[in-house]
Structure formats: structure tokens, C-alpha cells
Amino acid sequence: MDLENVSCPICLRKFDNLQALNAHLDVEHGFNDNEDSLGSNDSRLVNGKQKKARSVDSSAQKLKRSHWEKFKKGKSCCHTCGRTLNNNIGAINCRKCGKLYCRRHLPNMIKLNLSAQYDPRNGKWYNCCHDCFVTKPGYNDYGEVIDLTPEFFKVRNIKREDKNLRLLQLENRFVRLVDGLITLYNTYSRSIIHNLKMNSEMSKLERTVTPWRDDRSVLFCNICSEPFGLLLRKHHCRLCGMVVCDDANRNCSNEISIGYLMSAASDLPFEYNIQKDDLLHIPISIRLCSHCIDMLFIGRKFNKDVRMPLSGIFAKYDSMQNISKVIDSLLPIFEDSLNSLKVETAKDSENTLDPKNLNDLARLRHKLLNSFNLYNTLTRQLLSVEPQSHLERQLQNSIKIASAAYINEKILPLKSLPAILNPEGHKTNEDGQKAEPEVKKLSQLMIENLTIKEVKELREELMVLKEQSYLIESTIQDYKKQRRLEEIVTLNKNLEELHSRIHTVQSKLGDHGFN
């Protein structure tokens, strides 16, 4: 018998001799955990010689192993990754909880006493799993916390104050410049000779509003950094005095009519009123750099856009979104109730159904169909709005496709609705009072003719389906002109589903349908 190359029968690890194997079984797999085996000093015969079994220490110094999970070849799995444990990936017990893990998922070390309990002061370091590591006392319980919020507030307030001061400075310069230019225009615009003097006075006023930077030392535009030359002239911003270029492609500076500037900043305290004094078409322009334009007018434009009412397209789309939220909230409730009803009828089809549940489901279905009809009406109204730009036309097409896909997706679950969800109306008894609704069996309800309520709801559904079919067909025609073939394939599939559903509804209606 070869006693030199032996393998562990549990984890298949190879050892040079039996002594190493016995020590491995005692330490790693807990075969020497009993008191008898821990205190035994029986000798073993190895290669014809007596040798004492190797032990980690005396029995009083060994870690508790009775709680360790026993290894079963081909059955034991790692509690973290779930892989079957073998010699390649290892089979190691967590010293704390005793569960088996592979070598990869037992990387942590904790201090334990001989009873396998947490002992950070007097314990020794042992391998443990991630769960035992993170659940030890004191793990991530506390730490140094430095609240930097006041510092961030301070920095933000400084930057905000600087920006507000800069904006206030530009606004004061702008008001002073506009009022001065209008005053000069009203004074000198009556004769040609006075016009020559007016230009000189305006130039002096512009230089007094803000100091201009010496353009002789400036070789590059302060915004786009392009070098000045014969084709790229130097200009001064009338509010900040910075030297910029006049390239139309880069928009570093622009000459803007004073009337449009006043209308864009109508909240400023100008001396003149643009409407009363008829200043909208006054022939005076002011050159401003892009930085000053952004600081003065972007915030005002944003606030103005927020206060403005939504355009026709966006108003209709907002209403469509509100209806879709109602549909999304009602549809799961309806489907859950319908599924529970199907489960009840599947158990025993001869049982009578609760009339209260039937009425609730019929009411939910009626709400859903009305919501779909309203959603479809809003879609038609949105498409009838004349777009004001190419962007709005693109938005209309996108909304048309999205609404068709939405209704096609949401309304199809209603096609499986059985006739039991439309109970007959309450009947009156002989005394003239309303009696309880008649409860029928499922087999009886499925073979009867359609009621007036069913015909009405099927007609509403058919109307919605035909409208969606028309929308998709028109979209397909538009996409054929634009050669968007990939999207046409998807739309054709949706159209086939709609036609199939339309045919089903029409077959149910029969003579009660309409063309």
C-alpha cells in the first residue's frame, strides 16, 4: 500500500504522508473534536514505525469545532456562491458559524476565543465568512463624521453673491446706457447736422458707462481666442468693456436694437416706456458680448417661459399623461380581480358568482374603456393642432406612435374579458323595489346572447381599435416616404395585431356591429 501520496477523503487534498493527513483531518474537518479524541495520545503505525499523531496544541487550547458543518462529497455547496465544494475550490468551515465555504468566499479574519465567540482583546485570528465579519460587535458602528455642509453653503453663497453683484452692476450700466442713448436721440434727431453731433455724444456716453479696455494690447478675442486681423475686427462690449470679435458664426458679440433689449428686460426701471414713447423701432443698436447677454437675459427668458401657458400640443400631451396615469392605476386592480375570479371559476364552474364582485369588475372595465376613449380623443385633438415649427411636427409624429403603441399594449388584456363581468341590471320585484341581481352559473352566461351593455362596450372598443389602426396606417405611409424601413416592420406587426382584434370584436358583434 502506497502511504506516501495520500488524499483527504473529504476535500481530496493530497498529502505526503499519513501524519500530515491526520493533522489535516483534525484541524480542518474537526475529526478530533470529541473529548476522548482530543485527549488521546495513541500512537499510529506509519511505514512500520510508531509516531504520535500531530496536534495543534493541547485539548484546552483548541478551537471549538462541534458546530462545524460536516463535509459531504458531491453534496456540500458553498453558502455564498452555491458551487459544489471539491479539492479545486476548497472546502473550509467558517470558524464562527461553522458553515462550509470555498476558499474564495472565506477571505476575512476575526478574533475569536476557544468557544468560537467574538473576543477582540484576548482572541486569536481565525478565518470567517463575510456575514460573521460584518455582524461582529463594533463593525461600522461609528466613525469620525465631518459635516461639510456649512462650508459648501458658504462657498455657494459667496459665488451667488458675486454673481448677483455682477448682475446688479450690469443692470445699472444697462439702464444708464439705454436712458442716455434715448435722451440723446430725442435731442439730436431733428436735423442732419445734429445727427453728426449725436453720434459723437453717444460714443462719449458709452465710454463713460464702463471703462473700455485698451484694444492696442489685445491680440485675441476674449471669448473665442481667435486672433484679430484684417477680416476679424475688434469691438468693445458696451456693458463690460471687453474686446471681442464680430464673427457671425461664433456670436461673440452682436448689435441688438435698443427696443428689443428694453422689451426683453421690461422689469428694469427705465426712464422711458417702450410702448408709450414708441421706442420699439428706434434706429439705435447696442453691441453686447455673449457673456453679458447671457447674464442679463437668459434668466429673464426662463422665468418668462415658465409663466407662459403651454402651447396647444403640450397642453394636450399633458392631459394625455394624466389619463395614462389613471389607466395605469386602474388596470392592475382590474387584472388582479379578474385573475382571482378566474381562479374561483376554474375550481368549480357550477358555483354561482358573487354579484358584488361582478358589479365591481364591470364598473372597472367601464372606467377603463372610457379612459381609453378619452385618451384616443385627446390624441386626435393633438394631431389636429397645426404645428408652429418643424420640431413640433416631429413631436406630433412621436406622440402619435407612442399613443398607438400604448393603447395597443394596454387595451389587449381586455379582450379576454368573459361575459360574466357584465351582469344584468337589477330587476324589480312585484312590490316595485329593486331586487338583488340574478346570479347565474358560468356555463349559462357563456352561451347566452350579448346584452345591450356588452354591445355598447364592444362598439366602444371597436371604435378605439379602428382609430388606432388608422393612426398606424398613416404613420406607415409617412415612414415609407422617409425610407425608415426598420420601424415599418414593427408597426406592421402592431397593425396585424390590431386587425386581428378588430376581426374578433366584429365577429362577436355580428349584426350589432358597424362598418
From Swiss-Prot:
Note the subunit structure.
Interacts with VPS21, VPS45, PEP3 and PEP5.
Which GO terms label this protein's molecular function in UniProt? Answer: phosphatidylinositol-3-phosphate binding; zinc ion binding
Q: Where does Zn(2+) 2 bind?
A: C94, C97, C129, C132
Zinc finger intervals, C2H2-type: 6-29
| Record: residues binding Zn(2+) 3 | C221, C224, C245, C252
Q: What else is known?
A: Present with 768 molecules/cell in log phase SD medium.
Q: Which UniProt keywords apply?
A: Membrane, Metal-binding, Repeat, Vacuole, Zinc, Zinc-finger
What GO biological process, any one, is recorded here?
Answer: vacuole inheritance
Q: Which organism is it from?
A: Saccharomyces cerevisiae (strain ATCC 204508 / S288c) (Baker's yeast)
- Protein name from the UniProt record: Vacuolar segregation protein PEP7
Q: State where it is primarily located.
A: membrane
Q: What does this protein do?
A: Required for vacuole segregation and vacuole protein sorting. Possibly part of a complex which tethers the vacuole membrane to microtubules, either directly or via kinesin or dynein-like motor proteins. Probably functions in several interorganelle traffic pathways.
Where Zn(2+) 1 is bound, by residue? C78, C81, C102, H105
Binding positions (Zn(2+) 4): C237, C240, C289, C292
Q: Where are the zinc fingers (FYVE-type)?
A: 72-137, 215-297
Q: Name one Pfam family in it.
A: Rbsn
Q: Where is this region: Disordered?
A: 36-58
Show the GO cellular component annotation of the record.
Answer: cytoplasm; cytoplasmic side of endosome membrane; cytosol; nucleus; vacuolar membrane
Q: Where in the cell is it found?
A: Vacuole membrane
Please name the SUPFAM superfamilies in this protein's record.
Answer: FYVE/PHD zinc finger (SSF57903), Rabenosyn-5 Rab-binding domain-like (SSF140125)
Q: Does the entry feature the keyword Repeat, yes or no?
A: yes
Source superkingdom: Eukaryota
Membrane association type: Peripheral membrane protein
